[in-house]
């Protein structure tokens, strides 16, 4: 094996074949690089690469450059010379004259060198029996019914739709005595490699088109992107009535409608690799038409508000948190002006308020009695509520919507949002109870989860106040009650098939961990008995294991990239993954019997694989758990890398 003249005799000149294929950094160590050694994978160096001379390499680069120049020349000559229609000219002029902060930098899939995880996600290309072994086993007194999951081994290849075998109950009550000593069968399974769909990630900035102008999209392209959105992304964030959207996009030329047309297309771009080059166009036009709504006083249009939500969501996924905060802050102020947070206030109370505030601004949405349109307005408001909670979780900024006690708007109704929907009368956020009726959807469940999480955050920041323990106990009870209310969405079938239910479950468990983390910190500050700390740690660890099991239910398939729920819900599940890693870190530091530690390490590896799947190694959430990765490496070195075959 040749070594690099610039390196040491113990390094190769080029990366190993596996690292080259994944386009990740390789330390080129001989005889086996550290990444392959960690993953227990075969490591080999192609001798052909070692024998290439500098002239051969230069020739290859020149050939690639010539092909690129030829392709650019073809694209230039193929540009249409005909005069654009008036509407498209207006879009181009608008794009060049009015801009917000600016469009993202250009996305070139081959230019981004994203770290492929040291811990690759196993794929679902294995049989269902293997998946059952991945999910592993628990102690007999663990309330998670994983026996049903292990039963999948007898149904290899069976569809998960409607299968009772996948309907395992992931619901847990703290009073049931959950045990965190969990043994995972995946500790003896090789972790199959899956390239993390790097080019589909939205954490690379996009660049503005040349000369600050935007190229418009054809109606065919827009229709294709809209279909991508409504057939995949929509179900993870369902607040737009597709029937109304389809009718208005063809019959209205208002800037609000046009802004929403491009915003929906922008969201559709996120699920298709070949559409990445259209993101810059959609993003720029969506923002420019949204700016035009303010310039031309089209503020009282639901389309404008929905466009802001989709733009803010895209910016958050792009790691442009400051920009997303401004966009969603604009949407929050618009909701206040339109009084969406009080849209279900009683007529008598509404009349009194109108008389009290008649000197204020008179901005309002057009009056309607259409129940479907009213339901769409509610879902739009709650969509903003959920997005704002993400920004606060990520940044710590203040919540910009009205305080919860001032919200007089009903929860989202069950049913697909379309023209034939008959919405149910739903309670408000403050009037919800543990009664089984009315039906609470997973989308409404996310609203309830966000309200609980915000209360937990506030209590965690007030550890010095005398009422901390009272509030902590009340929040633990409220968490138990919420699990009972949402139990129908917290089974394996729902978590596999419903992206909203998946993120709902993970965030509920993460909220549990956050509450217990606050209690652990308070215990340590007050010097309370170690038994109280151990109880909080046990509960947090149990929740972390259950997050890991839910992730195991949604392992991505290389043949169904568009159904990758982990990637689809990336913006909402990074925090739960991080909280679970922190809880398991404490368990790893504490140590214990070998079976328990093996289960902890296996879970940490799978959680890191999921986090690497949705974020770069230098991302915010990775920086929050650097101590966990360091501890895992220390454990690996101490155990000579032979305790786990992952």
Swiss-Prot record:
Record keywords: DNA-binding, Metal-binding, Nucleus, Transcription, Transcription regulation, Zinc
DNA-binding region: 16-43
SMART domains: GAL4 (SM00066)
A Pfam family: Fungal_trans
Main location: nucleus
InterPro entries linked to this entry: TF_fung (IPR050815), Transcription_factor_dom_fun (IPR007219), Zn2-C6_fun-type_DNA-bd_sf (IPR036864), Zn2Cys6_DnaBD (IPR001138)
GO terms under cellular component: nucleus
Keyword Electron transport belongs to the record: no
Region (Disordered): 76-130, 345-366
Effect of gene knockout: Affects the expression of all the depudecin cluster genes and impairs the production of depudecin.
Localization per record: Nucleus
Chain intervals with Polar residues compositional bias: 349-360
MF GO annotations: DNA binding; DNA-binding transcription factor activity, RNA polymerase II-specific; zinc ion binding
GO biological process, one term: DNA-templated transcription
Regions crossing the membrane: none
Function comment: Transcription factor that positively regulates the expression of the gene cluster that mediates the biosynthesis of depudecin, a highly oxidized eleven-carbon linear polyketide that acts as a histone deacetylase (HDAC) inhibitor and makes a small contribution to pathogenesis.
PANTHER family according to UniProt: TRANSCRIPTION FACTOR DOMAIN-CONTAINING PROTEIN-RELATED, ZN(II)2CYS6 TRANSCRIPTION FACTOR (EUROFUNG)-RELATED
Designated name of the protein: Depudecin biosynthesis cluster-specific transcription activator DEP6
Natural source organism: Alternaria brassicicola
Gene from which the chain derives: DEP6
């Amino acid at each position: 094996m040749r070594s690099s003249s610039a390196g040491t005799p113990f390094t190769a000149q080029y990366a190993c074949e596996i690292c080259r294929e994944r386009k990740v950094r390789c330390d080129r160590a001989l005889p086996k690089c550290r990444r392959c050694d960690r993953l227990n994978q075969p490591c080999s160096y192609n001798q052909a690469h070692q024998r290439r001379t500098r002239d051969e390499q230069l020739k290859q680069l020149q050939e690639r450059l010539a092909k690129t120049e030829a392709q650019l020349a073809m694209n230039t000559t193929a540009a249409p010379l005909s005069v654009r229609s008036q509407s498209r000219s207006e879009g181009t002029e608008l794009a060049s004259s009015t801009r917000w902060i600016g469009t993202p930098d250009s996305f070139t899939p081959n230019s981004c060198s994203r770290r492929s995880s040291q811990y690759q996600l196993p794929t679902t290309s294995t049989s269902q029996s293997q998946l059952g072994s991945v999910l592993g086993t628990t102690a007999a007194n663990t309330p998670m019914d994983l026996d049903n999951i292990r039963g999948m081994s007898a149904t290899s290849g069976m569809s998960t739709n409607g299968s009772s075998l996948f309907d395992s109950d992931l619901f847990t009550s703290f009073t049931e005595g959950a045990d965190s000593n969990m043994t995972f069968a995946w500790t003896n399974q090789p972790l199959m490699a899956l390239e993390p769909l790097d080019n589909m990630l939205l954490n690379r900035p996009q660049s503005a088109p040349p000369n600050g102008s935007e190229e418009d999209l054809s109606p065919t392209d827009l229709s294709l992107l809209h279909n991508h959105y409504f057939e995949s992304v929509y179900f993870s964030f369902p607040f737009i009535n597709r029937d109304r959207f389809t009718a208005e996009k063809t019959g209205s030329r208002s800037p609000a409608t046009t802004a929403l047309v491009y915003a929906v297309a922008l969201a559709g771009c996120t699920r298709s690799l070949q559409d990445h080059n259209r993101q810059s166009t959609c993003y720029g036009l969506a923002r420019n038409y949204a700016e035009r709504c303010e310039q031309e006083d089209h503020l009282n249009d639901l389309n404008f508000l929905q466009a802001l939500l989709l733009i803010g969501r895209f910016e958050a996924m792009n790691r442009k948190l400051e920009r997303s905060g401004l966009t969603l802050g604009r949407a929050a102020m618009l909701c206040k002006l339109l009084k969406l947070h009080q849209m279900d206030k009683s007529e008598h109370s509404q009349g009194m308020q109108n008389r009290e505030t008649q000197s204020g601004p008179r901005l309002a949405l057009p009056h309607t009695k259409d129940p479907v349109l009213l339901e769409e307005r509610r879902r739009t408001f709650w969509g903003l509520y959920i997005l704002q909670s993400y920004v606060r979780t990520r940044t710590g900024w203040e919540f910009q919507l009205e305080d919860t006690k001032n919200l007089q708007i009903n929860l989202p109704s069950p049913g697909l949002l379309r023209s034939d929907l008959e919405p149910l009368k739903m309670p408000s956020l403050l009037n919800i109870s543990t009664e089984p009726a009315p039906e609470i959807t997973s989308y409404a469940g996310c609203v309830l989860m966000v309200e609980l999480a915000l209360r937990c955050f506030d209590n965690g920041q007030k550890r010095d106040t005398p009422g901390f323990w009272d509030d902590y106990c009340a929040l633990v009870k409220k968490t138990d009650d919420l699990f009972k209310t949402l139990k129908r969405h917290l089974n394996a079938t729902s978590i596999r098939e419903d992206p909203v239910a998946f993120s709902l479950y993970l965030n509920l468990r993460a909220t549990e961990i956050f509450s217990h983390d606050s209690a652990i910190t308070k215990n340590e500050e007050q010097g309370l008995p170690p038994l109280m700390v151990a109880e909080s740690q046990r509960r947090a660890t149990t929740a972390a294991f259950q997050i890991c099991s839910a992730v195991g239910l949604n392992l991505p398939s290389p043949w169904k990239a568009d159904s990758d729920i982990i990637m689809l819900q990336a913006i909402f599940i990074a925090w739960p993954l991080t909280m679970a890693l922190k809880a398991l870190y404490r368990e790893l530091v504490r140590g214990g019997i070998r079976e328990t530690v093996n289960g902890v390490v296996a879970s940490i590896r799978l959680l890191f694989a999921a986090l690497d799947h949705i974020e770069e190694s230098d991302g915010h959430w990775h920086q929050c758990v650097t101590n966990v990765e360091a501890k895992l490496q220390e454990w690996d070195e101490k155990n000579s890398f032979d305790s786990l075959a992952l």
